[in-house]
């Protein structure tokens, strides 16, 4: 049965015409390769089973490889599947096994949402004892139910199509790590006194009986998370050449301390888990007039823990990683809320994750800094996406919706843009682009540069007037 991996590499691997780490990105981001370049894209479908057009295309390419293969390969295929003639059902089964093989390789590096980690050797062992009549039925007429039954036999869980990436916090799946459990012992430093020694021993004694796991480790995680959230800069004591805990450590090294792993994961999560993206400013001619600014303009409420924008309103921002942001908590008005306000504690909570760590961020802002005695003025534009995982939009083929500030200089409203790619988003704030809201299309308001008798020109109009367009 050890021939199965060799067979998959000979017949299915040539159908993957892409660069390295593409399969890793495929399982993390959901779609990270050009269509037609990877056979695993057969499993990226919103339908009940595989996409018929994509399957037919790869089957034709696979059949050409099958005709050129060696007699030994045909003999191994007959020995494993008891088939002399290549059929589409056998191709679908081989593609599924290749999908499982690549999944096992990815799960050696990191843990993914709802994907069970099993070694490929164990998969081969279980596949060997799969009932022959069920295998023949699958080869004769492949369907989702037959493939799902085989998947249940191998992994003891249902097959998720497409590849599961729809979670509350997709970024954190990168940092779940290998065998990440909450039973790590936290080392306590204390003085050698009798009344002090009895307290840790008592905690250790009752922690083994607690059904909630190791509460000391949970408390330590909470302290680390709160510190990383409140501090602007901090150091994490990471061993040299062991910065990436996703990569399996060498046998001579000890396990990476889980509390340090959690600190590293929290730090990376704070930088990656967000629904607000900063846009490059190619041209400053769209800098807004400060005469029309309001104090509450362009403020979005971001949950620092899950990264979602909580005041996007009723706008439905489509995204491959998106899900409905509707809260399951209802108030007296029977309306769903993204923000929960407690009348007892006078504290607001995120209705998606329950966190109190809420931050306010402006999607358009002019700021002034002093650098080496020189006054520097900056203009920042930002976009709000429908997912909290910013890395999912880095693929050129992914289309998504965004909320951006209106391009009119006298308007402080927002615009909902549909089917935007990352290339279009990076070129959005440029001289030739125009994205105005519906109100600005039917009205005109004068800025400082439009008034003939304007004496004090605002800061925004000065930037728009003096900075040369690119």
Swiss-Prot record:
Keywords: Host membrane, Membrane, Transmembrane, Transmembrane helix. It holds the Pfam family Herpes_UL49_1. It comes from the Viruses. It is a single-pass membrane protein. GO terms for cellular component: host cell membrane; membrane; viral tegument. The chain crosses the membrane at residues 80-102. GO terms for biological process: viral process. It is found in: Host membrane. This is Protein U33. The lineage of its organism: Viruses, Duplodnaviria, Heunggongvirae, Peploviricota, Herviviricetes.
